């Protein structure tokens, strides 16, 4: 039970950091390669 409470308190922090880093990475890629995210076939 104690491990579950530790996990529940750590998981939102880790997921917030992970999604923040992922969003920042996508923004930087989109800044340098603005046409990479559009599907131009």
From Swiss-Prot:
The keyword Coiled coil does not apply. The chain crosses the membrane at residues 7-27. One of its GO terms (biological process) is photosynthesis. It is a single-pass membrane protein. GO terms for cellular component: chloroplast thylakoid membrane; photosystem I. May help in the organization of the PsaE and PsaF subunits. This is Photosystem I reaction center subunit IX. The lineage of its organism: Eukaryota, Viridiplantae, Streptophyta, Embryophyta, Tracheophyta.
């Amino acid at each position: 039970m104690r491990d579950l409470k530790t996990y529940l308190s750590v998981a939102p922090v880790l997921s917030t950091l992970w999604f923040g880093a992922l969003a920042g990475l996508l923004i930087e890629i989109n800044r340098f390669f603005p046409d990479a995210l559009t599907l131009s076939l």
